[in-house]
A protein has these predicted regions:
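A contiguous, well-ordered beta/alpha segment that forms the leading edge of an enzyme domain
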Residues: 1-148, 157-171
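A glycine- and small-aliphatic-rich helix-loop capping segment at beta-alpha/alpha-beta transitions
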Residues: 164, 186-189
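Beta-rich nucleic-acid/ligand-interaction surfaces
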Residues: 177-186
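Single conserved hydrophobic/aromatic residue that forms the stacking wall/gate
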Residues: 190-198
């Protein structure tokens, strides 16, 4: 078990000379339990580095887009963007622009302003993103952006990129049983007994 700054990563590793290693880890992040299974020829230490990187990345994403964390960038924007245009970090700006575009592409069914005071379906049109200045301004008081319907999917795509960078080809990542990423071969194949093992 490895102690981290904001929680605990619990892990288990099993190695087979025939199939390689299976590494399991779990920890809490983004208000849910994260379960990770990694399979391949990497060592336990190499897999733990991957999980550490995933944990750190999820903490980073939370600090950007968790509107329930008063210290997050998004919470600060929600507080001040109706007063004057607020500068936005590159990554969060791209998230917001993507979500506003999704609202248009889904005919309003995906809406990050749905938790706003006095919400109406056209309230998102009052969210002004300025790409040149990279700022956010609310043209109506009471707007509150909530990325909860987006953030886990975004996190899984970030995890996919991390797994590729660490050359992990077989993985299963479960975020609270609601958002799942599966890559490569079924990890249970790595633990199935071989006829040669009998």
């Amino acid at each position: 078990m490895k102690q981290k700054a904001f929680g605990v990563i619990q892990s288990y590793y099993k190695h087979s000379p025939v199939y390689g290693g299976v590494f399991y880890a779990c920890f809490f992040s983004m208000h849910t339990r994260i379960d990770i299974v990694l399979c391949g020829q990497q060592s336990e230490e190499e897999f733990l580095l991957v999980v550490d990187a995933i944990y750190d990345r999820l903490c980073q994403i939370e600090k950007l887009g968790n509107c329930y964390d008063a210290d997050s960038e998004l919470a600060q924007l929600n507080q001040f963007a109706a007063i004057r245009p607020q500068p936005v970090s590159h990554e969060l700006y791209n998230m917001l622009a993507f979500c506003v575009d999704c609202n248009a592409r889904t005919n309003g069914h995906f809406d990050i302003t749905v938790h706003s005071t006095d919400y109406t379906p056209d309230l998102i049109s009052k969210v002004q993103l300025s790409p040149k200045e990279r700022t956010l301004f609310f043209q109506h008081p009471g707007i509150n952006i909530n990325l909860s319907g987006f953030l886990k999917g975004y996190a899984l795509e970030s995890i996919r990129d991390l797994l590729r960078s660490y050359e992990v080809k077989n993985a299963l990542v479960n975020m609270g049983n609601s958002s799942v990423l599966a890559l490569g071969k079924h990890c249970l194949l790595y633990t199935s007994p071989s006829p040669r093992d009998k």
